[in-house]
């Protein structure tokens, strides 16, 4: 008669912590694996993805009460005409610039915030 997974789990549940640690060590030796190495590799994955972001989007979240100043700032940043800039501002939340470097995104954010807008960089 062979043991089922449930039998093994029940047996482990009845063991002391010391015995479980010894069991894990024995399994690591027998199968040539390490539980700690797998945890480190998984934890490092998301951090690497965040560091790789090179393109950013400047989102106009809200215009505020200085709409004219925000329209002027949008025109300067994008080169849009008056009507297009006005339409973009009135459609907030909307992307003002996409695929720009971090420095350009931060500069655009500062300019729009100075004009009175609420801005987010993604």
Swiss-Prot record:
SUPFAM superfamilies in the cross-refs: ClpS-like, Ribosomal protein L7/12, oligomerisation (N-terminal) domain
CDD domains: Ribosomal_L7_L12
Gene Ontology cellular-component annotations: cytosolic large ribosomal subunit
Matches recorded under InterPro entries: Ribosomal_bL12, Ribosomal_bL12_C, Ribosomal_bL12_C/ClpS-like, Ribosomal_bL12_oligo, Ribosomal_bL12_oligo_N_sf
Pfam families: Ribosomal_L12, Ribosomal_L12_N
Paired cysteines (S-S): none
The protein's role, per its UniProt record: Forms part of the ribosomal stalk which helps the ribosome interact with GTP-bound translation factors. Is thus essential for accurate translation.
NCBIfam families: L12 (TIGR00855)
UniProt keyword terms in alphabetical order: Ribonucleoprotein, Ribosomal protein
GO biological process, one term: translation
GO molecular function: mRNA binding; structural constituent of ribosome
SUBUNIT field: Homodimer. Part of the ribosomal stalk of the 50S ribosomal subunit. Forms a multimeric L10(L12)X complex, where L10 forms an elongated spine to which 2 to 4 L12 dimers bind in a sequential fashion. Binds GTP-bound translation factors.
Protein name (database record): Large ribosomal subunit protein bL12
Similarity annotation: Belongs to the bacterial ribosomal protein bL12 family.
């Amino acid at each position: 008669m062979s043991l089922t997974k449930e039998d093994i789990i029940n047996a482990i549940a009845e063991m002391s912590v010391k015995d479980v640690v010894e069991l894990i060590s024995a399994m690591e030796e027998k199968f040539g694996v390490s539980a700690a190495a797998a945890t480190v590799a998984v934890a490092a994955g998301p951090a690497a993805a965040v560091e790789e972001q090179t393109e950013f989007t400047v989102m106009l979240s809200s215009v505020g009460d200085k709409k004219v100043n925000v329209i002027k700032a949008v025109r300067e940043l994008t080169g849009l005409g008056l009507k297009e800039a006005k339409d973009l501002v009135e459609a907030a939340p909307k992307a003002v610039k996409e695929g720009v470097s971090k420095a350009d995104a931060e500069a655009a954010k500062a300019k729009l915030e100075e004009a009175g807008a609420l801005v987010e960089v993604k």
